[in-house]
Amino acid sequence: MTRKSFSFFLLGLILTVGIDQTVKYWIMHNMLLGTEIPLLPFLSLYHVRNSGIAFSFFSSFSHWGLIALTLIILIFLLWLWKNTEYNKFLSRFGLTLIIGGAIGNLIDRICFYYVIDYILFYIDDIFYFAVFNLADTFITLGVIAIVTEELRIWIKEKRHSKRTFSR
C-alpha cells in the first residue's frame, strides 16, 4: 500500500463520516422525531430512528450483536480494500465509501443505540421508499462503483477473448 493511496483512503473516510455525522447532528437538533420537511414533490427530510440495519433488517438482533456484526463486516471490508489492486481505482473508491458509510452508522449505533435516518423518497400516496441516510447512500454508491468497475473489466476481457479466439 502506498502512502498516497492510504492518504486518499483516510481523506475519503474523514469526508464521508464527517458529512454524514454533520447532517445527522443537524437533523437531531433541528427536527423532532417523526417530523417531515418537504424539499421537492418527491423528496422530504423525515426524522426517524432505525434499530436495525438496512431496511430495518436484523432489528431483532441485540444492540451489541449489531455492533459486533458491523465490526466483523468492517474488518472484512478493510481487508478487501487493502488487498484490492491499486489500478482498480473505482473499486478502492467504492470500498472507501462503503467503509465510511458503515462507520457513520456504527457511530450512531454506539452512541444512540439506533441509526438516525432522514431521507424519504415518495410518489404522492402511491409509493414510499424506506427512510435512509447519507451513510446508506455512500454504501449504495460504493457498491455501484465496484459493480461498475467489475462489469467494465468483464466486458473488456470478453472483447479481448473474442478477438483472440477469432484469430
Swiss-Prot record:
The keyword Endoplasmic reticulum does not apply. Pathway: Protein modification; lipoprotein biosynthesis (signal peptide cleavage). It comes from Bartonella quintana (strain Toulouse). GO terms for cellular component: plasma membrane. This is Lipoprotein signal peptidase. Coiled coil: none annotated. The keyword Cytoplasm does not apply. This protein specifically catalyzes the removal of signal peptides from prolipoproteins. Belongs to the peptidase A8 family.
